[in-house]
């Protein structure tokens, strides 16, 4: 109706900091300037409250929606990832969102929150949300607690030559982008993960191009990683590889783009998967699976992880890593925590190893 108005107000701790009123109309763009803006980051996850009020000609509220907003910027330049115009190193952990009772369904909202708190306690500033569309409440807690994430989709074993499967993926991906794009904690879109069949086929390349164009059309503000952790890339803003090499010397040699793949164009270079080390306890002895052998000596395990981190730190070209993984799941017993989220190790020691690489460059 022409006599209705939309009033948008932004609050900081209940204090009004910006407000604008406009006639109700489809497609209107509103700008709300905020003085002395407080930026969102994992270290200072500041959120503003925001309200949208539809009022009639007499100024009476007809409808009202309340939400929140985080102010932050992500971009890539000169082979680095930037958060709020500063280089930012991503210390990610792989989280597959499994739980002992509900499998892919978290038992409570508190469980989603706790996964983030435990990840931060272990020294990570974010996570790859691996092979799952995570609950909206997880993204809420990531916004609230300060935890960066990569948004992925479940496509393990998908055949891109199957037209129905490809169309379903594209449709679902659009829904996820539209649902989650306003979360400041999500900093990268990564729709595909290996192994997929026929990744060298023309139909797969077409699927990648379609996903990239759709993603950029809906959300041009975030980097796009076409095939996470593969080293096999078509059209990507981030160059990611996967290496579970346990030997630190050989691991260090693998930390570079594969010359046999598409030409590397100075994208931020990220280790999409590494680690996966098994610590054998009485709870994990049966059906144990991981990478690089099984450890029974805790000091030896810490030494292995630290040597891998040292290799990453010494490379000079790495913009982030993703350690496998947050918790044990089903047959995979290579988590920092057990399946029921109990710590396997001395968390202060684990944290000190992963935090050897600071999120931001140390200013001299």
Where are these regions (language model features)?
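Secreted/periplasmic carbohydrate-active enzymes, especially glycoside hydrolases
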Residues: 1-141, 145-146, 172, 187-188, ...
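Substrate-binding/catalytic cleft of secreted carbohydrate-active enzymes
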Residues: 114-119, 126-345, 349-354
């Amino acid at each position: 109706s022409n006599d209705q108005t939309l009033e948008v107000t932004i609050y900081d701790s209940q204090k009004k900091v910006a407000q604008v009123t406009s006639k109700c109309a489809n497609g209107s763009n509103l700008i709300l300037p905020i003085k002395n803006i407080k930026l969102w980051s994992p270290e200072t996850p500041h959120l503003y409250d925001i309200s949208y009020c539809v009022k009639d000609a007499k100024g009476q509220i007809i409808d009202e929606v309340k939400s929140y907003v985080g102010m932050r910027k992500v971009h890539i330049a000169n082979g680095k990832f930037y958060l709020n115009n500063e280089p930012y190193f991503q210390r990610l952990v792989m989280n597959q969102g499994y739980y002992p009772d509900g499998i892919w369904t978290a038992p409570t909202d508190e469980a989603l929150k706790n996964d983030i708190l435990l990840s931060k306690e272990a020294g990570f500033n974010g996570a790859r949300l691996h092979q799952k569309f995570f609950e909206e409440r997880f993204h809420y807690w990531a916004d609230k607690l300060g935890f960066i994430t990569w948004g992925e989709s479940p496509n393990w074993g998908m055949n891109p030559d199957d037209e129905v499967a490809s169309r379903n993926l594209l449709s679902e991906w659009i829904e996820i982008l539209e649902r989650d794009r306003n979360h400041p904690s999500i900093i990268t879109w990564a729709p595909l993960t290996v192994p997929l069949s026929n990744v060298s086929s023309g139909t797969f390349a077409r699927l990648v191009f379609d996903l990239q164009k759709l993603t950029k059309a809906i959300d041009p503000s975030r980097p796009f990683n076409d095939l996470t952790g593969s080293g096999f890339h078509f059209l990507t803003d981030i160059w990611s590889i996967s290496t579970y090499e346990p030997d630190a010397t050989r691991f260090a040699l693998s930390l570079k783009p594969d010359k046999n793949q598409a030409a590397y164009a100075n994208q931020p270079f990220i280790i999409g998967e590494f680690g996966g080390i098994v610590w054998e306890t009485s709870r994990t002895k049966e059906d144990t699976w991981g990478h690089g052998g099984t450890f029974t000596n805790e000091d030896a395990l810490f030494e292995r992880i630290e040597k891998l981190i040292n290799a990453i730190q010494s490379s000079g070209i790495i913009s982030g890593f993703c350690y496998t993984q947050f918790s044990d799941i089903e047959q995979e017993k290579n988590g920092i925590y057990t399946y029921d989220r109990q710590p396997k190790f001395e968390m202060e020691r684990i944290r000190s190893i992963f935090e050897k690489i600071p999120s931001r460059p140390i200013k001299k």
